[in-house]
Design a protein with these regions (language model features):
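Non-catalytic helical/linker scaffolds that mediate oligomerization, partner binding
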Residues: 1-250
Length: 250
């Protein structure tokens, strides 16, 4: 849905483009929002500001038009709120995964060593990857990286939590600390963004991938390129080519 005008956030309904409504998950976020809060929705530039908070809906003003779709991330720009690190849906998913003998888990939006401690206690015999994608994770980086073995930098969400021009610095900082602490860091998001609609990468993308490997990343993650892109196979093939060149000249 192309959003150009005012919208309402509703507590209990899903996207209703005909009545300018959408909802957010988890539902408890609704109660934390207040007047003048600034929200960045997804990665298509949509920005909205809370105008008025009612008991079951929030009226918002669109400050920058953009695309609204299902399952998009929402970032509160102007302040921080404290939510449970696992939702009811997360806990149910973990229960199902354990019953089906799943041994690998990733914790999104890891904010502190306390989050890692709780997750380790919940899943003592599984491999766990902790995602670094918030400003609080950057603030608590040393204590977080002292508590785990495997981490993943999500550059997309981190760029919304901080600013995009800081991402190269944060990436290098995390990878440098990882070498020192002898832990693994994987890097994700926007490696081959141009290949969403083009069979060939740009020189800038090639350099980004190679530099990330040189700096010590233990793995690279393709997301939208293979999930919804038009050239998923070509993306994987190109990534393998660069990794081969890196290993050859390492």
């Amino acid at each position: 849905v192309k959003i150009k005008k005012n919208y309402k956030i509703n507590k209990n309904i899903y996207i209703d483009k005909n009545n300018n409504n959408f909802n957010i998950y988890p539902p408890e976020v609704f109660d934390f929002l207040k007047k003048d809060d600034q929200l960045h929705v997804g990665f298509e530039g949509l920005k909205i500001v809370v105008v008025k908070h009612y008991s079951s809906r929030i009226k918002c003003k669109v400050t920058n038009p953009g695309i609204l779709d299902n399952n998009k991330g929402v970032h509160l720009i102007n302040r921080k709120i404290n939510l449970n690190y696992l939702t009811k849906k997360d806990k149910l998913a973990i229960e199902i995964a354990i019953k089906n003998n799943i041994k690998n888990f990733a914790l999104s939006f890891t904010n502190s060593a306390k989050d890692i401690y709780k997750f380790n206690k919940l899943l003592p015999n599984c491999r766990k990857i902790f995602k670094l994608e918030t400003s609080r994770a950057i603030k608590n980086l040393d204590s977080i990286m002292n508590c785990g073995k495997d981490f993943l930098i999500d550059r997309g969400d981190l760029s919304k939590e901080t600013t995009i021009e800081k991402i190269p610095f944060y990436q290098k900082l995390i990878l440098k600390k990882a070498k020192k602490k002898k832990v693994n860091v994987f890097v994700a998001t926007n490696f081959l963004e141009s290949m969403m609609n083009n069979p060939y990468p740009t020189r800038g993308e090639a350099n980004d991938i190679y530099t990330t490997l040189v700096d010590g990343a233990k793995g690279l993650v393709l997301a939208g390129e293979t999930a919804v892109g038009n050239f998923p196979t070509e993306c994987v093939q190109f990534l393998l080519k660069i990794i081969k060149v890196f290993k050859l000249h390492k």
